[in-house]
Amino acid sequence: MHDLATIILLGIIEGLTEFLPVSSTGHLILASEMLGFTGEGSAAFKIAIQLGAILAVLVAYRARFWGVGMGLLRADPAAVAFTRNILIGFLPAMLVGAVAYEGVRALLESPATVAVALLVGGIAILAIERMVKVVKVESVEAMPLRTAIAIGAVQCIAMIPGVSRSGATIMGALLMGVERRTAAEFSFFLAVPTMMGATAYSLWKDRAILTFDDMNAIAIGLFVAFLVALVVVKAFVAIVGRFGFAPFAWYRIIVGGGALLWLAWK
């Protein structure tokens, strides 16, 4: 597909950005445009390597997931509520994604869409941070069913590249009165079924055009993304707890504005 350095660089970008509200897909699209990373398998690569970051969540929160699994065997109410909220939150993305997949893939080739979404999303994050003051939900287990459904519906907006899946779900959670750290963690957990489904669907759809080299590139990019995300996922929660989401909003505005200038100049 492309040289090893490019594949590793894209894996690093994915690992750094998947759980930040800055759009990992948007960064991959812009980076691919700058690096000339194109070809029939490139779109599948950009989706599939996100699985590496998702595996990092399973490792980083392995004790939490193990506890939930054991709790389900005992029909523990907290474990049941946790699982219910994740599955309910995943449902809207599964339904909309199945219908809108081809349209989303077309948008994946538009750096201009990414730049605008980054810019607008940054402004939205700043506005929501100022608006939200009341905390009603302090854990995933305590989240009402309607809140999980609403956050899942908001996640569908992130099918537009540059919006950010984590950004959409976290901001949606904040608007529903979810505490910051809980909002971030729910976004992580919700990513597991969402991105596993997206990766499996993308690889299945592109199975006829993916070569052995493409699959090797995906494996390398996925592994690099996993290693980097393993560090980022815990650090992000600590940063949010101390500084909130404003730093990421300003970053989006700068990158989105810079990308628009670059595209206009190019």
From Swiss-Prot:
HAMAP family: Undec_diphosphatase
Swiss-Prot/TrEMBL catalytic activity: di-trans,octa-cis-undecaprenyl diphosphate + H2O = di-trans,octa-cis-undecaprenyl phosphate + phosphate + H(+)
EC number: 3.6.1.27
This protein's name: Undecaprenyl-diphosphatase
Entry GO terms, CC: plasma membrane
One Pfam assignment: BacA
Keyword Cell wall biogenesis/degradation: yes
One GO BP annotation of this record: response to antibiotic
Membrane topology: Multi-pass membrane protein
Enzyme superclass (EC): hydrolase
